[in-house]
Amino acid sequence: MEEEVAALVIDNGSGMCKAGFAGDDAPRAVFPSIDGRSRHHGIMIGMGQKDSYVGDEAQSKRGILTLRYPIEHGVVTNWDDMEKIWHHTFYNELRVAPEEHPVLLTEAPINPKSNREKMTQIMFETFNAPAFYVSIQAVLSLYASGRTTGIVLDSGDGVTTVVPIYEGFALPHAIRRVDMAGRDLTDYLMKILAERGYTFSTTAEREIVRDIKEKLCYVAHDFEQEIQTAAQSSSLEKSYELPDAQVITIGDRFRAPQALFHASVLGLESAGIDVTTFNSIMKCDVDVRKELYGNIVMSGGTTMFPQGISDRMQKEITASAPSSAMKVKIIAPPERKYSVWIGGSILASLTTFQQMWISKQEYDESGPSIVHHKCF
């Protein structure tokens, strides 16, 4: 492979798509993983109206569209929409011809095997990529943090995973996955706001609630204490201006993120992120636990709450750890929203990685199932 052809790195999240060129230190394009279909008939001729819109354009026209996310809980549920998002990524965002560049995609662990086979098939058959690779998101986050040992808590919009990695090897028996992440918190916040008399019902209005969550919500260090403070004073209240200039005030801004630690409020049986991380460490060999406790790496957009999430995590895991002498360290890099992409950029530009790609020739010989042999 010639040196000058940069590989394309695409981190297809359930909520946001991050795309760019290997070797760059940040993605060139970051846009919502959304396909929007018109709810109304266009009657004005010559306006260039389209049947469907993707990404930011869908977001800006959301008032007249039905928005769909083709990736749910890290698994692609609508391949036609997914193809549109990839087409948009290559031709509109990055402005490249996919047949000229190797493509690295990312995936959540413990995904159905058919998901990565179909990804492989589309990249080679629809987009004619010369080479392809799919990598586990949490492993890339660890690359980005410059470590080879650590336990990665990766929480995005659709799925939260905990992956322990020792000396560069993922420990598959201890991987934990919870299908609760940012989108569930957004839905929970919609419910909380509905109790206050603010109803958001359409797919477009849900995006407003997501914005409220990202701008106003935070993780309480002590949930019970915070509830008392919120009940007794208005010091925690913040206001938000809706697109129609109506202003709403929210006091208990810590309630929605609390679901990360107590999934039962969402009606889910799964444990919170703290307990899931602890359980994963306890599933690992006793000799490696100490290093995992000292290298808990956070990544993904749902770990980006402006205050409190790493302190709370530190407090909960220290309380669970078998001895008080155990040093618990939470690493929350400021760029963790994009650390999966950054890790992919590092990996795809390593000279030692170049023999790892699945080539078009190998695909033609073996078919989509080759992805299970070549990508771990």
Swiss-Prot record:
Alphabetized GO MF terms: ATP binding; hydrolase activity
Keyword Protein biosynthesis: no
Source species of the chain: Hypocrea jecorina (Trichoderma reesei)
Keyword Nucleotide-binding: yes
Protein name per the record: Actin
Family: Belongs to the actin family.
Enzyme category, top tier: hydrolase
Function: Actins are highly conserved proteins that are involved in various types of cell motility and are ubiquitously expressed in all eukaryotic cells.
Subcellular location, record wording: Cytoplasm, Cytoskeleton
Keywords of this entry: ATP-binding, Cytoplasm, Cytoskeleton, Hydrolase, Nucleotide-binding
Taxonomic classification: Eukaryota, Fungi, Dikarya, Ascomycota, Pezizomycotina
EC number of the protein: 3.6.4.-
One Pfam family it belongs to: Actin
Catalytic activity, reaction form: ATP + H2O = ADP + phosphate + H(+)
Gene3D superfamilies noted in UniProt: 3.30.420.40, Actin, Chain A, domain 4
Xref: PANTHER family: ACTIN
GO cellular component terms, A-Z: cytoplasm; cytoskeleton
Family annotation (CDD domains): ASKHA_NBD_actin
